[in-house]
A protein has these predicted regions:
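Alpha/beta catalytic barrel-like cores
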Residues: 1-137, 145-150, 197-297
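Eukaryote-skewed repeat-based solenoidal scaffolds used as protein-protein interaction platforms
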Residues: 139-213
Length: 297
């Protein structure tokens, strides 16, 4: 059963969703921005220990609570670890009132027909069982759109909804994330096609079924407003997608009903060697700015 208290917080809460789900591929970059170079770890497991310390430090900072941070997206290894002596998802909800989500995709295929589809996920049912046992509320999976290709975008969205049905069958709420690359010249056209495909699939969902959408901030403000208002959509969240935090916040504030789900923009300005006071002050300032942009639209 979907937790109704958590569902209500995600559906109507005033705040944003923190993305703490850097995977193996993006972890070295995230650590480097945090001031931890490759010379600080000698193995992948040491690298993951360090990134978990960073995530735990963020989750335990005083400003990181459900008042402004409605939910947090975790990497599988984070779900399996502890924060302050409790399993991560339990800690987030019980101690911080932050709704836990799990990143479930296994990365991207090579580009074909202007898009990058998700790699196969043969272990997904087992992972979803573990997520349920851990108290996870929903999932997130990312694919990418690199061109305004009608057939490519149709295939991309179809794959997302096909896997979403498996996730829904496990009583979890899927965050569907077909990211549009911000640097492409035909971004506005790709977004037009994406809106059409998403609407088509949302219309086909059974009654009383809801999903979430995580989308690149569009070229035209309120382009995705029909999705914000769609009965099959619990919430629309935006990724920062390579925009600076200021640019992402500015774009976000022009899109009514859309809230943030930022990763890099959340950790911008944090450093491993900051004192707790400086670290917590930086996190509080960042959370304030992303929260303000999320509620401005």
């Amino acid at each position: 059963m979907v937790d109704q208290q958590q569902a209500e917080q995600i559906r109507s809460g005033s705040g944003f969703i923190a993305a703490l789900d850097q995977s193996g591929g993006s972890t070295p970059k995230a650590l480097a921005l945090y001031g931890v170079g490759k010379d600080a770890y000698g193995s992948e497991s040491e690298m993951f220990d360090l990134i978990h310390q960073m995530r735990a430090r963020i989750a335990q900072s005083p400003a990181f609570t459900g008042d402004r941070v409605l939910g947090a997206i975790l990497f599988e290894m984070t779900m399996d670890r502890m924060i302050d002596g409790k399993p991560s998802a339990t800690y987030l909800w019980q101690d911080r009132r932050v709704v836990p989500f799990l990143k479930v995709d296994k990365g991207l295929e090579d580009i074909a027909d202007g898009v990058r589809l998700m790699k196969p996920m043969p272990d997904l049912p087992a992972l979803l069982e573990r997520a349920n046992a851990a108290g996870i509320f929903g999932t997130k999976m990312r694919s990418v759109i690199d061109a305004a290709s009608p057939t490519g975008i149709a295939a991309n969205v179809a794959q997302q909804f096909e896997i979403a049905r498996t996730i829904l069958a496990h009583d979890l709420i899927p965050i569907i994330e077909p990211e549009v690359t911000i640097s492409i010249t035909d971004k506005a056209e790709a977004e037009k096609l994406l809106l059409e495909e998403l609407t088509k699939h949302l219309d086909a969902l059974p009654a009383d079924t809801q999903v979430m959408l995580k989308l690149t901030l569009p070229e035209t403000a309120n382009h995705y407003k029909p999705l914000v208002d769609h009965p099959a959509v619990m919430r629309v969240v935006a990724l920062s997608g390579g925009y600076s935090r200021d640019e992402a916040n500015a774009r976000l504030s022009r899109n009514s009903g859309v809230i943030a789900s930022f990763s890099r923009a959340l950790t911008e300005g944090l450093s491993a060697d900051q004192s707790d006071a400086a670290f917590n002050a930086q996190i509080a300032s960042t959370i304030d700015s992303i929260h303000a942009a999320s509620v401005a639209g």
